[in-house]
Amino acid sequence: VGIREATIAGQGIGMALRGLRPLAEIQYLDYLAYAIQILSDDLACLRYRTKAGQKAPLIVSTRGHRLEGIWHSGSPMQFILGALRGMLVLVPRNMTQAAGFYNLLLQCDDPALVIEPLNGYRLKEKLPENLGDFTIPVGVPEILDEGTDVTLVTYGSCVRVAQDAMKQLQQCGISVELIDVQSL
């Protein structure tokens, strides 16, 4: 496969339509724009167009959403959410959560976009003993911290940023509830 995002997506869709479970990687979130038309027109609406007669369980993996380099400074999340109605859009806060999403996606027939946290690749994480089996449910926010003064709702790479802000607020006597929505 060449380094042409539309080709990567198109070949992944073709493989998925033939019964395989491909995982197509788009190097950075900003590059997804080059594949958005084929993902929107050919994948996201496939079940709707065929009255659930066809499925293409393609998993598109990318990284980004925050802390990108000078050439990857955008965050096209609103654009992505609007264009990919019909696909799961998952934004794990760390790589353990990402593994849970991938495990789930390998068991279901929904196409999905997983946006891995670029600021989490080199972090040490506590791993579950069943790393190859555990799943993270889609559409279920997780309350990471209980609080009484402020509720902070975030996702993906911004969870770590929010946790740092919480520490500063706690020093001022402000109790913060932190919710990770995980899927958009």
Question: Where are the regions a protein language model picked out?
Answer:
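Short beta->alpha junction loops
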Residues: G2-R4, I179-L184
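Conserved thiamine diphosphate
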Residues: I3-T7, I13-T151, C158-V161, V176
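Redox- and metal-dependent alpha/beta enzyme cores, enriched for Fe-S-associated oxidoreductases
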Residues: T154-S175, I179-Q182
